[in-house]
Each structure stands twice: as C-alpha cells, then as structure tokens.
Amino acid sequence: MVTIRLTRGGVKKRPFYQVVVTDSRSPRDGCFLEKVGFFNPTAQGQAERLRLDTDRINHWVGLGAQLSDRVAKLVKDNAVAA
C-alpha cells in the first residue's frame, strides 16, 4: 500500500521532516516515490514552517494513497491557513 508520511532529517534535537510518498513497508527514512513537501517544527521568525504540494498530494490520494495521521493533520491545517 502506498502511504504519504514524514521522514526525519536534521540533527539531534533539531528535527526537519520531508513529506514523502512511499510504500508502507519501507523503513521510515528509506527510499520514497516522490517528495511532496516539508515540515519544520522548529522554525522561528520568518522561516517557512510548512510547504505542501497539494496538487500532487491530491493526485496520490486519488490513486489510493493513505495519509498518515500527522500528515493528515498538516494537510488540514494548511488548507485552513490558505
């Protein structure tokens, strides 16, 4: 099954997440099919906290991809903010 979820990057105590489309059986930080955005929970000041390519997310959901709980919340918050 294809899922849209977060992969962790950054350094210790300063996480940075990529929003990726991947096979649900692959490891969290393993290979992915497509990168569709990023989430920076520690963004300060003018730094961009969240960027999502909603067209591509809707495309993958239309093909049957499942959103993880956290990504679903981010998509919902992004839609309200826009």
From Swiss-Prot:
Transmembrane segments: none annotated. One of its GO terms (cellular component) is cytoplasm. Keywords: Ribonucleoprotein, Ribosomal protein. One of its GO terms (molecular function) is structural constituent of ribosome. One of its GO terms (biological process) is translation. Belongs to the bacterial ribosomal protein bS16 family. This is Small ribosomal subunit protein bS16.
